[in-house]
Design a protein with these regions (language model features):
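Serine residues within intrinsically disordered or low-complexity segments
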Residues: 34, 38-40
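C-terminal regulatory domains involved in ligand/effector binding and gene-expression control
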Residues: 41-138, 142-303
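Positively charged N-terminal leader segments that act as targeting/secretion signals
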Residues: 3-6
Length: 303
C-alpha cells in the first residue's frame, strides 16, 4: 500500500529520516546566538543558561530492531559538551560519539550514530528528543548495547529518568541556532522545512496515510519542557502488521511488540488499550523530529 507522508518540522531540513532525505548543513540560513531577547519565547527566557543533569539515572529495556537487552544511563556533562553517547560493553575501550549530524552513519528506519570505525548506537532519536525537549544542553548517554532501548515506544521513560537525575543550571549562557530564512527539502509530495520564528521553537506536522486507521493527522507544538512532557512524550512509535515479515527478513523490528509499538492492520488498531491520543502517530512524528533536530548540536529558534 502506497503511503504519503507530509511533514513540516520547525528547524533543520534533516528531519525527514523515514523519507530518505539527506541531512544538510545549515550554512548561511542560520546563525548562532548566545543571548535571546525577552520577546523570543517562554522556552528561551526560562532557560537562559546551559543545563546538565544533577546525577545519573538508568533505564533498562530491549532494542526495537535488534531485540537485544540494553542498559542506558544518563549522566552530567560539562559546559559546552553537548549531548554525547558513550558506547560501553565493547571488547575494546569505550567509544564516545557526539550527537551531531556529522555522526550519523545510517537513517534506515532509525537514526544510527557512529564514527570512522562504524556504527555505535542505533535508534537514538527518542532519548535525544527527551533531552532536548526537557531543556538539557549537556549530558552523557551511556549505552551497553548496539541500540537505545525502545521502552514503551515513546520518550516517557527517558523523561522519568531525567526527572530522577534532576536538572541543574551551569555557569555559561545557552547558545542557540536562529533560523534566518526559509529553506525546504522535498521528495515527491513530502517535505521538511525550516523558517524564521520569533517565539522560540515551534514544530508543525502533518501525515497522510492511505491506511484508514491512521489517515491524515495534524499536530503542532510550541516547545517547552512542560509542553513536551504533556503533549508528545507519551506518543508511541507505530507500524503496520502487514510490514512485519518484510521487516523481520531485513533484520528490523525484532524487538517490537504490543508493549512498545502501536500496531494496526488494514482496518483496525490491534493494541487492546487503543491510542493514547487521537493523533498519536502525528505526535510521535513530532517527537522523532525533535530528536533528530537535536543533532544540530544546539537548540533551534525557528518554526
Amino acid at each position: 500500500v502506497k503511503k504519503r507522508e507530509l511533514a513540516c518540522f520547525g528547524g533543520l531540513t534533516m528531519v525527514c529520516r523515514d523519507l530518505g532525505i539527506p541531512r544538510r548543513r545549515i550554512g548561511a540560513n542560520a546563525r548562532f546566538r548566545s543571548r535571546v531577547k525577552s520577546g523570543s519565547g517562554r522556552f528561551a527566557m526560562k532557560f537562559s543558561r546551559q543545563t546538565t543533569l544533577r546525577s545519573h539515572a538508568t533505564v533498562t529495556g530491549v532494542g526495537v530492531h535488534s531485540g537485544l537487552p540494553v542498559n542506558l544511563t544518563l549522566g552530567p556533562a560539562p559546559v559546552d559538551a553537548g549531548l554525547v553517547f558513550v558506547r560501553t560493553g565493547l571488547d575494546e575501550a569505550d567509544r564516545e560519539v557526539p550527537a551531531v549530524a556529522g555522526s550519523v552513519v545510517s537513517t534506515d528506519l532509525a537514526t544510527v550514530l557512529g564514527d570512522r570505525q562504524g556504527p555505535l548506537v542505533s535508534t537514538a532519536e527518542h532519548v535525544l528528543a527527551a533531552l532536548r525537549g526537557m531543556g538539557v544542553d549537556n549530558a552523557t548517554v551511556e549505552v551497553d548495547g548496539p541500540e537505545v532501548p525502545i521502552m514503551d515506544g515513546s520518550a516517557a521513560a527517558f523523561v522519568a529518568a531525567i526527572d530522577q537525575a534532576g536538572i541543574v543550571n551551569q555557569s555559561a549562557a545557552r547558545r542557540y541556532i536562529q533560523v534566518l530564512k526559509p529553506v525546504r527539502v522535498a521528495m515527491g509530495e513530502s517535505f521538511g522545512e525550516l523558517r524564521p520564528h520569533t517565539g522560540g521553537f515551534r514544530a508543525e506536522v502533518e501525515i497522510d496515510f492511505a491506511n484508514p486507521v491512521v489517515g491524515r493527522q495534524n499536530f503542532s507544538i510550541d516547545l517547552s519542557p512542560e509542553s513536551f512532557r504533556r503533549e508528545i512524550s507519551r506518543a508511541r512509535t507505530f507500524g503496520c502488521m502487514n510490514d512485519t515479515a518484510r521487516l523481520w527478513s531485513a533484520g528490523f523490528a525484532l524487538g517490537a511488540s504490543f508493549e512498545n509499538t502501536v500496531v494496526f492492520d488494514d482496518t483496525r488498531l490491534l493494541n487492546p488499550e487503543g491510542f493514547r491520543y487521537s493523533n498519536e502517530c502525528a505526535r510521535h512524528k513530532a517527537l522523532d523530529a525533535i530528536g533528530d533536530l537535536a543533532l544540530a548540536g544546539l537548540p533551534l529558534l525557528g518554526a
